[in-house]
Amino acid sequence: HADKGAVQVGGTSNVSELVQHFGLPAGDRLAGSAAWKSSIDIKHHQTDLVIESDLLGVSSRLPEPLAKAATSPLALRVEKTTAEAGRQQYRATLGNVAQAVFIKRAEVLERAVVALGTGDASLPERGVAVRIAVPQFDADAWKELLAGSGNGNGGRGSKSLPALDVVSIKTPT
């Protein structure tokens, strides 16, 4: 048997189907379809995955800086790797707009960071951090989104968001 292998695949996915399948929060604010490509690497019984898309054809009614017209490309890269001690690391990069890193062990979130704009994307020692550094930040729009009072299903049917341990927001004065 082989100890390593690689697979390259691609296709087009509809955002509403992904939202429904994964229970993504605020999924009612995303629409459209986009082409994607993926590479799966298997080495020594560990699987690493990379998914990339230009999100052309997907629109977002999320608050800035995550709003996007369907006709505008925005590079998305999602990586899943096996980290130390059986942990899984998930890293997502959305152009120069956002980054996120999640560390999970046995499907339990151990620590994570979400960074918008030029926010620091380093993982906290423990818990969940959100760091935002953008020219303008609409706190009311984000509060509405996080409260689940947006348009559409109002957040019903989506997975709940974890409690935040660190929140940092920086805007020019």
Where are the model-predicted features located?
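Membrane-proximal interfacial segments on either side of biological membranes
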Residues: 1-90, 102-173
